[in-house]
Amino acid sequence: MSTEIKTQVVVLGAGPAGYSAAFRCADLGLETVIVERYSTLGGVCLNVGCIPSKALLHVAKVIEEAKALAEHGIVFGEPKTDIDKIRTWKEKVITQLTGGLAGMAKGRKVKVVNGLGKFTGANTLEVEGENGKTVINFDNAIIAAGSRPIQLPFIPHEDPRVWDSTDALELKSVPKRMLVMGGGIIGLEMGTVYHALGSEIDVVEMFDQVIPAADKDVVKVFTKRIRKKFNLMLETKVTAVEAKEDGIYVSMEGKKAPVEAQRYDAVLVAIGRVPNGKNLDAGKAGVEVDDRGFIRVDKQMRTNVPHIFAIGDIVGQPMLAHKGVHEGHVAAEVISGLKHYFDPKVIPSIAYTEPEVAWVGLTEKEAKEKGISYETATFPWAASGRAIASDCADGMTKLIFDKETHRVIGGAIVGTNGGELLGEIGLAIEMGCDAEDIALTIHAHPTLHESVGLAAEVFEGSITDLPNAKAKKK
């Protein structure tokens, strides 16, 4: 069966970038169609990414906190985990959110076509779905087709014991021993979940630190904590992976590499993601796709074809949902005739581990690369009353300032709920705040977020909660 649709805007992909673009188009009075390969809206993020991982991380955090309370006189005993019930709860979270999106699409009269969409011309798209073929004729298109996990040719990905992030989130079993390939955000988050559920976790990372994008001093605080949970093998890489009946055997080389191949019950490959740009027949619409699968756009999210836009993971790093959402708004607004641009000063990044690692703006590494003279100020959570009282004193808040103007240009927080505390730093950078602005803003006490104000006081030399190196000597 074949059907044909005519619309003002078609959005290819219904992840956070895609559905945000589609809903914004509808709100601006544009007839809009979404094409989505999943049976529900939300894309990778909501169905097999950001949201289910946070649901499982919440479970992991509660398990770890319950164990930690034994030192303070409250003993719950060993937790008994029922992974079927945990999985059911995770699916309930997803269903609630996807149902909400479906309701909003219906309320906005956004038509949803399920299936795999590919371009057949500059103004036509063909969708192969369970109910047959749908041809969509459009005036404007927004490509929001996302990304997928990287696969390496020497790894037997077809073996059910070799996982990508989607497999790990299915929570089919809890392996006794698990290897995480890649010390980035996804791998560390999944390692956190499975460690809490009882797995022995090894992490192999080719760089000299996990979370390579963050500054060393920030990661050092994090690493000190997670070494109690994970066996970290830094400056080490995997050279061979062999599937045998009794396990997955992994050979490594490097600074921390074991001499012999190691046997694992599961191997999580979390070495990054690749864009889906080559899977869309975009060339038939005249859209240029580079060798890696990325689609180049301008600040209005236009591709080289003026009426076709691209947003989200497919346009480049960072591959983050919140970046894609804002790009989607811009694309929709430009199509509607508004002169809007995607020009953020900062895009925050967060590892939702325990402790969380969050940063926004320039890191020290980036400031050096740009030739910017800067100074840093840090406030250790070991001096925070709220952190000590909450048993999370192994954290740190760091601010980076322009040396001449004293404006904040970057910041990082490592500690419990660090991602929830990062917003003030991002807003401060967007608004052009300097150290004095932050230091003179009265922060509630005792809180974790007051550490941002206290870090600014360290820079200003007005700190009284720490020894003051800038105090005048008598």
Predicted segment positions?
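Flexible, glycine-rich terminal cap/loop adjacent to redox cofactors
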Residues: 10-21, 26-38, 44, 51, ...
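Glycine-rich Rossmann-fold phosphate-binding loop(s) that bind the pyrophosphate
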Residues: 13-16, 181-184, 313
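FAD-site-proximal beta/loop scaffold in flavoenzymes
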Residues: 158-176, 262-335
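Glycine-rich flavin
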Residues: 2-7, 17, 23-31, 36-174, ...
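Short hydrophobic core segments
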Residues: 10-12, 117, 136-146, 180-181, ...
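Glycine-rich dinucleotide-binding loop and its adjacent helix/turn
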Residues: 50, 145-200, 204, 232, ...
